[in-house]
Amino acid sequence: MTKKDKKPKVATITTKSGETLKVFEDLAQFEDFLKHETEDDDDFDNVHCQLKYYPPFVLHEAHDDPEKIKDTANSHSKKYVRHLHQHVEKHLLKEIKEALQLPDLKFKDKSKDEDFEKIVWNYGDTGEFHDRKFRISISVTCKHDDAMVDLDYKTVPLTEESVI
């Protein structure tokens, strides 16, 4: 038997507008990236990442086998939506704050957009790290057709003019 290949599940894409976008498939690797991004890189205040993953509670229920995930685990299930919202509010945002080493982030700019196709939770806040202010925006989307969650993470530097 061969060992399972543990290569990082990340792809770097350059959009038509020239923006660099990192796409992750694993929550732990995304969190590791955030932690190392603030430690190692000067571009921590200008990052755009996307993550597509199954929430831990879904994988736990399916015994860590994506093939066993129920078809009912989607945005039409009240139980799934409730558990996903708890996962985002109590775990994901907290882990992002810890990875960024910014315990003062409160993500007080919250909104929820809901339609038949999907539910989107938006979170935003401003932070400061190494005397540089930036805006952080997180968008979490669940769709009606499967349990996969899309997370969009973006930081934008704030200049003195944009703060005033």
Swiss-Prot record:
Compartment(s) where it occurs, according to its Swiss-Prot or TrEMBL record: Cell membrane
Signal peptide: none
Principal localisation: membrane
InterPro entries named among the record's database cross-references: RGI1, RGI1_sf
Gene Ontology, cellular component aspect: plasma membrane
Annotated membrane topology: Peripheral membrane protein
GO BP annotations, alphabetical order: energy reserve metabolic process
Keywords noted in UniProt: Cell membrane, Membrane
Role noted for this protein: Involved in the control of energetic metabolism and significantly contribute to cell fitness, especially under respiratory growth conditions.
Family: Belongs to the RGI1 family.
Protein name: Respiratory growth induced protein 1
Source organism per UniProt: Vanderwaltozyma polyspora (strain ATCC 22028 / DSM 70294 / BCRC 21397 / CBS 2163 / NBRC 10782 / NRRL Y-8283 / UCD 57-17)
